[in-house]
Structures are given as C-alpha cells and as structure tokens.
Amino acid sequence: MDSNPGADQAVAPIVEQALRTAMSAGWEVRGTTSPNPPVGAVIISTSGEIVGTGATQPVGGVHAEVQALADAAGKTEGATAVVTLEPCRHTGRTGPCTQALIEAGIKDVLFLHSDPNPSAGGGEQVLVDAGINVVQLPSPEGVPDALIPWLKSVQLRRPHVTLKFAQTIDGFTAAADGTSQWITGEMARDYVHADREHRDAIIIGTGTALIDNPSLTARYPDGTQREHQPRRVVIGRRNIADAGDAASNLNRLGFEQYATIDEALAELYATGARDVLVEGGAGLASGFANQGLVDWLQVYQAPLLLGEGISVLAHPLTNTLKGASALCPRAASGAGR
C-alpha cells in the first residue's frame, strides 16, 4: 500500500486525466445520489488508455466503480481504477465495490478521498489484503469537487448548507419598499436554476413563502422543468398549507414545513438529504448564520446602488469588527448583471 499523495503514479499524465474525468462524472450526478455520495470512477487499461467511466446512480442503482467496470468490459484484467472516493466494503442495496474490483482483476486502485463513513470505510485495507496496490491521490487544481458537501455532511451529521443570496453592491437584497425582482440578470437566474437541480433541497422561510409565492423548482430558460427536482422546504411556524393564494405554488407542487432550523436539518438528514440550498429570507439567513450552520455562501452581486433597503441578514451577528465572521473565498466569476 502506498498512501503517499506524492507517489510517481499519482502525477502521471494519464492518471491526472483520469482523475479529472472521474471528478467530472461525479459532478454531473450531484443531487441525484443522496444519501450516497456522488462518486466518479475511471478505468485505465494496461495499454494506458481510458476504457471505462462511471458515476454513482440513484439509490438502488450501481455505484461508480461497478458502472465503470461494466463500461470497460473485457479490458479490466490488470487495469487501474481511479476513483474519487475510497471504494466501499459493505453490502447494502448493492454489493461491495471492493469485491467488484477484485473480481474484475484490477491491479491498482487510486482514490482521492478516504471514506469517513464507518459502515462503508475501510475499503483500502480490503483491497491491499487482496494484493491490489492502493494509492491516495492529491486533489488536482481547478476542478470542482462534488464530494466536499457529502464529506462535510457525514462529518457533521447534518446536511451541508449553502446560503444563497443576491445583493446590490452596497449590500441590500431588496429596496426599502420591498421590491427585489430583479436585482440580478437573466444569466445569474439561469445559473441558479441549474444549481438547484443538483441540490437535495431548497429551503426558505415562511415570510419568503408568503411574500414571493415561489415554486422552488429547477427550470430551463424556456420554463420547462429540469429532470431532477429538489425537495421544497419551508421553515417557520406560520401555516403555509392554509395560506391559500399567497402560497398557491408551493401548495400545488407540494412542500415540507418544519417549525425550526434544527428540526428541519435533523429530519432532512434522516431522510437522505446531504446538500441543501438556503434561499431566504433575511430572518432565516440570520438564523442559520447565528447558529454557525452556514458552510458555504453563494453570493450574486449586482452593480446597483440603493443607499438603503433590506439587508441580507435581519439580525446582527456581532457588534464589533473583531467578532465578524471570517470567510474564505473559493471562486468568483461573472454572470451578467
């Protein structure tokens, strides 16, 4: 076993290409695999060619390694498997991926992340005991990693939370009269819908539900619905089911309501959600932030000035600069206005 991320095999061009391909495959299935992780896998033949690619299928379907092995049928003996997550060793709805790799005659297994799940982890040692060379790879630069939210969720025993909001350049999410449509442009809104498709749930507060009457669906620019739809979740004590026309879209499409943030996150995690998007409003955003429950921020900033208006957070987090929450920027890009 060689768990040194700097091993020569880890930096071979074909291995880096295979890892990037595997990460891309995992990225594409985000939102469709929970509670299982969105894993990608690639098979490299003995001649050094990529001959199989796979990704985790929805619950009950095959795991990434099994799909990649099937894609590489007849070319797996002595081959190398490159996987974004340590292969599982447990039997659930499907058999252990370690056994599938062993039976396929795989010689080397290169993986990116260790599996923190006690029931599934430990696959590395199973493979080593079977005589397979195992190497843990370093993360390549500039490649989105679909597993980060899932890994964080397993660690925290709650869904990974991204707080999303749009704001003017002076920090307001709506004007003083309450108008907010639209701070951002069409390109940004299209991106939001594409992102929603890859989330397990979209969360809003009762105020947003009653004021905006949102659908919380993932749609294409022409208005048609995308293939995967996240769960629609409302947090708060006002009864949305009895709100009539004020919340007609949610009542037509169906939604879940929980009284508190803690109750919502506990039930969402228990029922398989691992990656959720909080879309507002200011009171709910404050609640998540004050409880230290925001893992990522997704901010759309428009080149607009208001001077006054409704802030992102309804309640302060601190009254001193020393108490401010320090953030670590991950990426920035343009998305129109």
From Swiss-Prot:
Pfam families: dCMP_cyt_deam_1 (PF00383), RibD_C (PF01872)
Region Reductase, residue ranges: 158-337
NCBIfam families: eubact_ribD (TIGR00326)
Pathway(s) served: Cofactor biosynthesis; riboflavin biosynthesis; 5-amino-6-(D-ribitylamino)uracil from GTP: step 2/4; Cofactor biosynthesis; riboflavin biosynthesis; 5-amino-6-(D-ribitylamino)uracil from GTP: step 3/4
InterPro entries: APOBEC/CMP_deaminase_Zn-bd, CMP_dCMP_dom, Cytidine_deaminase-like, DHFR-like_dom_sf, Eubact_RibD, RibDG_C, Riboflavin_Biosynth_HTPR
Taxonomic superkingdom: Bacteria
Cofactor note: Binds 1 zinc ion.
Catalytic activity, reaction form: 2,5-diamino-6-hydroxy-4-(5-phosphoribosylamino)-pyrimidine + H2O + H(+) = 5-amino-6-(5-phospho-D-ribosylamino)uracil + NH4(+); 5-amino-6-(5-phospho-D-ribitylamino)uracil + NADP(+) = 5-amino-6-(5-phospho-D-ribosylamino)uracil + NADPH + H(+)
Designated name of the protein: Riboflavin biosynthesis protein RibD
Gene responsible for this protein: ribD
Family according to the record: In the N-terminal section; belongs to the cytidine and deoxycytidylate deaminase family.
Cofactors named for this entry: Zn(2+)
Region entry Deaminase, spans: 1-157
Organism: Corynebacterium ammoniagenes
EC number: 3.5.4.26, 1.1.1.193
Role description: Converts 2,5-diamino-6-(ribosylamino)-4(3h)-pyrimidinone 5'-phosphate into 5-amino-6-(ribosylamino)-2,4(1h,3h)-pyrimidinedione 5'-phosphate.
